Amino acid sequence: MRNIFMSLVVIFGSLFSGCASGLIGTLPEVTNYSNASEIIIIRPFNFEAHGISAYVVFDNSDIFAIRIVQYAKFPAPPGNHTIGVRYPGLPTNNIAMLLAPKERYYYCIGANLANFSLFQITEKEALLFIKDLYYMSLDNNVK
């Protein structure tokens, strides 16, 4: 009986751990917030992979996990960087980008049964998504 109970705990724990969201690493170091770029990550609802958190990766470091119907934003220093998204335990699909000072960049997460994808969208497209999503705060100090 004890083995069955422990097996159920492990199974349900594994299922719910995929639903976690929030910081899993550190945000990019920004020394001058008045000059920082802002990155907004949007994860709208989709049926595929809806029970799995997407790991957002900036400059090859995991920074946060995000669930469906959430969006988050974070500051980043201007310059050349990479951003990506991945399933926990799988390689990252990275995008190279050049961030300009004081600019906003919007990225949307797509998913299928094999992996996540990340693509840049316009502000107009982002605002249409955001109105139906929950904001996930990453840090009280984010401007």
Regions found by a protein language model. Give the residues of each.
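Sec-dependent bacterial lipoprotein signal peptides
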Residues: 1-20
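Short loop/turn and low-complexity linker motifs enriched in small/turn-promoting residues
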Residues: 19-143
